[in-house]
């Protein structure tokens, strides 16, 4: 399916210059002179190269259609992750790099979606939101309530995020995996 250059979104898988690329970041730019364009940072899923490309609204790219299949995360073996197909119980080993920044949020027994291109796994999608425990949270500074103040906190997986002042150590919260932001209290 062809899409316009300005319709590219993070997470899209596109075909570009003979390769399969995953869009990591986009930035819409409207210069004072000339036409608007989309600055796209993407990673080649076959060899791991990264590149930045400008797409104008007149440019079109082929959006790759992927098959998705549910797998369950079993365990980690070095830098390999072992998943099990929930239908056939077949196990598959994948490189932990496929998860990118979402890697710390992978939990034992978690159901994930493997994205397959020509029956080869190219991406692992975790649930959008997961629960995590706060193991360390800074104290609230009195008088900091004039603006919507957030404070730094550390999750049980080692990731640092900003949380509201009322969140303390030991609190279970919901976190957006891909934005790595606080969503709310769990439960």
From Swiss-Prot:
PROSITE patterns documented for this protein: EFP
GO molecular function, one term: translation elongation factor activity
Pathway assigned to this chain's UniProt record: Protein biosynthesis; polypeptide chain elongation
Keywords assigned by UniProt, alphabetized: Cytoplasm, Elongation factor, Protein biosynthesis
SUPFAM superfamilies linked: Nucleic acid-binding proteins (SSF50249), Translation proteins SH3-like domain (SSF50104)
Pfam annotation, one family: EFP_N
Gene3D superfamilies (UniProt xref): 2.30.30.30, Nucleic acid-binding proteins
Coiled coil: none
InterPro entries given in the database record: Elong-fact-P_C (IPR015365), NA-bd_OB-fold (IPR012340), Rib_uL2_dom2 (IPR014722), Transl_elong_fac_P/YeiP (IPR020599), Transl_elong_KOW-like (IPR013185), Transl_elong_P/YeiP_cen (IPR001059), Transl_elong_P/YeiP_CS (IPR013852), Transl_elongation_fac_P (IPR011768)
Keyword ATP-binding assigned: no
Entry's Gene Ontology BP terms: peptide biosynthetic process
Location(s) in or outside the cell: Cytoplasm
Transmembrane domains' residue ranges: none
One CC-aspect GO term: cytoplasm
Superkingdom of the organism of origin: Bacteria
Function: Involved in peptide bond synthesis. Stimulates efficient translation and peptide-bond synthesis on native or reconstituted 70S ribosomes in vitro. Probably functions indirectly by altering the affinity of the ribosome for aminoacyl-tRNA, thus increasing their reactivity as acceptors for peptidyl transferase.
Family statement: Belongs to the elongation factor P family.
Protein name: Elongation factor P
Organism name: Erythrobacter litoralis (strain HTCC2594)
């Amino acid at each position: 399916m062809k899409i316009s250059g300005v319709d590219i979104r993070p997470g899209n898988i596109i075909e570009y210059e003979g390769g399969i690329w995953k869009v990591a970041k986009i930035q819409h730019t409207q210069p004072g002179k000339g036409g608007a364009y989309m600055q796209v940072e993407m990673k080649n899923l076959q060899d791991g190269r990264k590149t930045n490309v400008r797409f104008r609204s007149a440019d079109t790219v082929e959006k790759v259609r992927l098959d998705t299949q549910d797998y369950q995360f079993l365990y980690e073996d070095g830098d390999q992750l072992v998943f099990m197909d929930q239908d056939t119980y077949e196990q598959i080993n994948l490189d932990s790099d496929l998860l990118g920044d979402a890697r710390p949020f992978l939990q034992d027994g978690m159901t994930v979606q493997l994205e397959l291109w020509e029956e080869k796994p190219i991406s692992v999608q975790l649930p959008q939101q997961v629960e995590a425990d706060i193991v360390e949270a800074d104290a609230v500074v009195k008088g900091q309530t004039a603006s919507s103040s957030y404070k730094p906190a550390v999750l049980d997986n080692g990731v640092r995020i900003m949380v509201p002042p009322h969140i303390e150590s030991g609190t279970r919260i919901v976190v957006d995996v891909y934005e790595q932001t606080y969503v709310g209290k769990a439960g």
